[in-house]
Swiss-Prot record:
GO terms for cellular component: cytoplasm. The modification 4-aspartylphosphate is found at residue 58. It catalyses: [protein]-L-glutamate 5-O-methyl ester + H2O = L-glutamyl-[protein] + methanol + H(+); L-glutaminyl-[protein] + H2O = L-glutamyl-[protein] + NH4(+). Pfam families: CheB_methylest (PF01339), Response_reg (PF00072). It comes from Myxococcus xanthus (strain DK1622). Transmembrane segments: none annotated. The gene is cheB4. Belongs to the CheB family. Keywords: Chemotaxis, Cytoplasm, Hydrolase, Phosphoprotein. This is Protein-glutamate methylesterase/protein-glutamine glutaminase 4.
């Protein structure tokens, strides 16, 4: 029933950490714990038997780790999965791979009641579980180790009168996997810098950058304030900082106030890009929950920039791109498999790719 609590399966091998997670979840009457798994094998079995609303997934577990368990669940019994990980390098990289395998979000494992951030971290965990439990996980993108299915070549988009000078991308839920696929298909000769705002838990931005470096030939890094924005380089917004552009083509990393609760904010980035590049701006709104980016896209559209939005079918969550399309601000709505070719086509005949 609509008002029944969401049914959570907790997968965690440490008894202490598992008890803590169960207590945090049970503190919210909108959530209930229906099962506890001590390893990945149990997580898959319980997901099949209990059909929970969502699974919280540890990464390092005996018998089967969280990455393989996520893959199995997404293949055998598609269920929203939220990775709850430590900030250990090995765990961060595996967490990123779990996002590509189908997990919707990654959160830092709460440190315990003695931590000054415990209440805020616990509330963030519960809020994330409630939001992600509503996501319909019914599709998986094929792994690039398998031969890609042939797709028709899309018609060339209308040529913009102004050659883009930057590409600004925004994403939330489902974004890491979408970014990985996009970057795997862009050429090393891509002629302009790419800025990225990806909503992700604090502590995971550097790990995300390291993981995205393995996708393809483009260098990926967390942006530093004042550094020059180089063609064919990808710059991610740092933890809890806005990312934009200074007028002279350098990165601006800012501690300015959050925009509608977000820092980094897609709207902040799009506004900055619109001011710096005007009609030479190209914005891409990828899969994500909520409306971050809408007002910034509105300003970028008014400045003459071009806007692409991911289509509903290839989006994990059609929130961020959906509101842009609904506001009639998108010049094109593009399926994820076609996005790289759309971007490269924007530079054909103008000295670019």
């Amino acid at each position: 029933m609509k008002n029944d609590p969401l049914r959570i399966l907790v997968a965690e091998d440490s008894p202490t950490a598992r008890r803590l997670l169960v207590e945090i979840v049970r503190a919210d009457p909108a959530l209930t714990v229906v099962g506890e798994a001590r390893d990945g094998v149990e997580a898959v079995e319980l997901a099949q038997r209990l059909r929970p609303s969502l699974v919280t997934m540890d990464i390092q577990m005996p018998r089967m780790d969280g990455l393989e368990a996520t893959r199995r669940i997404m293949t055998e019994v598609p269920t929203p999965v939220v990775v709850v990980s430590t900030l250990v390098e090995r765990d961060i990289q595996t967490s990123m791979a779990a996002l590509r395998a189908g997990a919707l979000a990654v959160l830092q494992k709460p440190l315990g009641p003695e931590s000054p951030d415990f209440d805020a971290d616990s509330r963030r965990l519960r809020d994330t579980l409630k939001a992600m439990a509503e996501v319909k996980v019914v599709r998986r993108w094929p792994d690039r180790t398998a031969p890609p299915a042939p797709v028709p070549t899309p018609p060339a988009p209308p040529v913009s009168p102004t050659r883009p000078g930057v590409v600004a991308l925004a994403a939330s839920t489902g974004g890491p996997a979408a970014l990985f696929r996009l970057l795997s298909e862009l050429p090393a000769s891509f002629p302009v810098p790419l800025l990225v705002v990806q909503h992700i838990a604090i502590g995971f931005s550097e790990g995300l950058a390291q993981w995205l470096r393995t996708a393809g030939p483009l260098p990926v890094k967390v942006a530093e304030d004042g550094e020059p924005l180089l063609p064919g380089h990808v710059y991610l917004a740092p933890d809890d900082r806005h990312l934009g552009v200074r007028g002279e083509g350098r990165a601006e990393v800012s501690r300015a106030a959050p925009v509608n609760g977000f820092r980094p904010s897609a709207t902040w980035m799009f506004r900055s890009v619109a001011r710096a590049y005007g009609p030479a701006s190209l914005a891409v709104i990828l899969t994500g929950m909520g409306q971050d980016g809408l007002e910034g896209v509105r300003e970028l559209h008014g400045a003459g920039g071009r806007i692409l939005a991911q289509d509903e079918q290839s989006s994990v969550v059609y929130g961020m791109p959906g509101v842009v399309v609904g506001a009639n601000l998108a010049h094109e709505v593009v399926a994820l498999p076609d996005l790289a070719s759309r971007l490269t086509s924007a530079f054909r005949g103008s000295g670019g790719v």
